Amino acid sequence: METILRTENLCKIYGSGENQVYAVRNADIEIKKGEFAAIIGKSGSGKSTLLHMLGGLDYPTSGRVYLRNEDIFQLKEDDLAVMRRRKIGFIFQAFNLVSSVNVWENVVLPMGLDGQKIDVNFVQDILHTLNIENKVHSLPNTLSGGQQQRVAIARALASKPDIIFADEPTGNLDTKTSDEVVALLKMSAKKYGQTLVVITHDEDIAQIADRIFVIEDGKVGSRG
């Protein structure tokens, strides 16, 4: 199976001298195409820092991140920004929806801003899969938290990225809604052949992943 993402001795250090702190220490990670991987750790363990480097949002102190064998931090800043827009999808705890435009516009907005052709049939299928096709004309503030997160998931899927990163995607949701959103997220990723990496502190979410990475005090280990 093709390797989509891998790292080599990835490190992130804050401070210097006696105040030096390793947020991430010599992380070696490999994720295959189509996998649902979970990175689990307690608050402050370094998991969000790790995600930001994997997604090209923050530079490492040392080490490498390869997306489809391309060393992303060797790219020029403009080229890295293009890669993030076109090859990486992000889902965050806070939804990050634009309050002044409707569901459909929120989903297709990133592609429109990037000048990409919008596959209308594909987007409609995603909205149907996530059971929000009847909300396309609704504004985000009229939706429940679970529905808003489904819109965020649809937005990440719509551009057909190589990989999707979800940072505590159920952090603002109740348990029942969280379970529904995670099940939909996994099902959607499988249906559309997406590779999914979820950052979480929730063991229940991690247990349904294909591969689990555990981060503690910046050190990353694999559980399967």
Q: Where do the model's predicted regions map?
A:
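ABC family nucleotide-binding domain
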Residues: 4-215
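Short, Lys/Arg-enriched, disordered terminal segments
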Residues: 1-3, 224
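H-loop (His-switch) and adjacent beta-strand-loop-beta switch element
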Residues: 212-224
